[in-house]
A protein has these predicted regions:
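N-terminal beta-strand/alpha-helix entry module and adjacent surface
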Residues: 1-77, 93-115, 122-140
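Short beta-strands and strand-loop turn motifs
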Residues: 80-86
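Residues embedded in well-ordered beta-strands within globular domains across many folds
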Residues: 81, 119-120
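Conserved beta-strand edge residues that scaffold enzyme active sites
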Residues: 86, 120-122
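Short, solvent-exposed loop/turn segments at secondary-structure junctions
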Residues: 88-92
Length: 140
C-alpha cells in the first residue's frame, strides 16, 4: 500500500488513512516514528503527515503528546489521525501503544479535537510496502 498525500483529499477509511502515512514511514527507516495527519471536521486533509518524533524512549516510541496537538493546531485541524511504524514488522499493538492511544484520545476530546484513529504500520514485504492495523477498528 503506497500513496502520495493529496492535501484537500478526503479520508473515509482506515485503509486510505494508512496509505497516506506510507511515505513518511519509509523515511523513518529502522527507527520508530510517530506521525499526525491533520484534518478538518469533514475529513479533508489539511497538510501532509507531520513527523512528531523519531526513535525510542524506554522501549516505546518517544512521543511528546504536546507536539501531537501543537502540530494539529498549527494548521487549524478539527480532527487528527495518528500513526506510528513498527520497524520489527510486528503489527500487534503493545500495551504502551494502547495506553498512549487512550491518553491521546482523552486529551484530544478535552481540547475539542476529534481523535479518529491510531494506525500502526509494519513493513512485512519491501515490494508490497506496509501492512497496517487500525486501533479504532480493531481495538478501541
Amino acid at each position: 500500500m503506497e500513496n502520495k498525500v493529496i492535501v484537500g483529499a478526503y479520508v473515509e477509511t482506515a485503509m486510505q488513512a494508512a496509505a497516506l502515512f506510507c511515505d513518511v514511514a519509509k523515511m523513518a527507516g529502522e527507527q520508530e516514528g510517530f506521525y499526525v495527519l491533520p484534518l478538518d471536521g469533514g475529513g479533508k486533509v489539511l497538510a501532509e503527515p507531520i513527523i512528531v518524533s523519531l526513535g525510542y524512549r524506554e522501549g516505546v516510541a518517544a512521543v511528546d503528546q504536546k507536539e501531537v496537538f501543537k502540530a494539529a493546531f498549527k494548521v487549524g485541524a478539527d480532527a487528527i489521525i495518528v500513526a506510528h511504524n513498527h520497524p520489527s514488522g510486528v503489527l500487534k499493538p503493545s500495551k504502551a501503544d494502547l495506553h498512549l492511544t487512550e491518553e491521546l484520545k482523552s486529551r484530544a476530546e478535552w481540547l475539542g479535537l476529534e481523535f479518529i484513529d491510531h494506525i500502526i504500520l509494519a513493513s512485512t514485504d519491501s515490494a508490497k510496502g506496509f501492512d497496517f492495523v487500525s486501533l479504532a477498528e480493531g481495538v478501541l
